[in-house]
């Protein structure tokens, strides 16, 4: 997710938005109205396709609304600061147009296989754009190969692993049991093809989205007093030098790029605008107008990022679990019982430095700093990546042989050890080993701030549903990519079985 990829993803969306005269923005709400209308749920006479326009979008959303909406948002706000949410919104605003274009093209250039099923996606659009010449064929094959590989990785193993870990940590059910049940459920559904997947998605996706949105709104309004400060942090840190994970402020350009990188990256991971995957499911829609279906499918980016991801982001920001100044200083920490190594340096009368490595461990009666002989020491600690909160202390890095300097004073702040764990120094000289809460755990802490332990269960259930729907959606994407390469029905049936079995290994 470097500058080149950011320019390609966001830049393409910006170009198309201006090129289309902001049509996608102006037609967003009419498109949402059309999406939720009765007409979008039926297959009209005169068109062709496998499923209704609504079912096609729900199948596409099944693959896009996943762990990124819960884990990805939290990770972006930790790594890129709260301001990463702003860049998610910006990328989604222009990603709407990208999604419109790729889905409309997919329907325009779709074909019908021997079984009367629709086949579409970027591989077909690319071939048409190059007039079926060799460069287009090569690019189309490459896209299909990468989509097929992604179906097993991001669309299968990653999601299955998230489900089994969540079920094990919350309900203490062995991972192999979860894997077995999940494998059987996926196999039963995907063997029915697009009809079965779309029927399940049409019920599961709206239900799980409403479930999560309602729970998130309860958390947000339960922390209503924290909303102003949370919003302030989100917008200020999107353009400030205090949004780098670890809490160290850098140059404005560097930290903005970091916030932008994580915001755009996690946003695309969540809504898949520009990746082309949603266009594969869009091609199955029963319609005679590719522009109309393009408008309907672009609503997926709005619902995924502007709605669901925003719920997660505001729940985290308003609850205060992320912190009020930066992502690592005042965040939510948990005690880490593992030993950590720090370097201590004694300033004597001759201003000499003692560079002995000590181990600091938690004890039953509190905390202690001991040397390698087991003696309690009073040396002033110095570790990597100093963060001072109240007093100015002159520390340089000492780890890895870099000279350290110190002034004798009471310390208050947060440092990191060799492994990157946070070490917090309090005013009374106590030392605590603290690990920053990240990912799904951070979202759980946000929900727990209002709903208690029930909040943890709700996030876990949401994570399970989101990940399960992603598996179903990506099975269809991978199958159609394989059909483009192999063009034999038997291969697709074999893929369905193999895909389902791979779920167990996740």
Segment roles from a protein language model:
Residues 16-17, 91-116, 127-161, 165-189, ...:
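Helix-loop-helix module between adjacent transmembrane segments
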Residues 102-110, 215-235, 244-251, 285, ...:
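Extracellular/periplasmic helix-exit of transmembrane alpha-helices
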Residues 8-32, 160-167, 174-236:
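Membrane-interface loop-to-helix entry segments
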Residues 6-11, 137-145, 169-194, 210-211, ...:
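Transmembrane alpha-helical segments of multi-pass small-molecule transport proteins
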Residues 1-63, 67, 77-84, 95:
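N-terminal alpha-helical transmembrane segments of multi-pass membrane transport
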Residues 42-77, 105-129, 145-148, 249-302:
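Alpha-helical membrane segments and immediately flanking helix-loop junctions
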Residues 324-355, 359-360, 396-400, 409, ...:
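N-terminal glycine/threonine-rich, aromatic-flanked beta-hairpin/loop signature
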Residues 384-414:
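N-terminal helix-cap/turn-to-beta initiation motif at the start of protein domains
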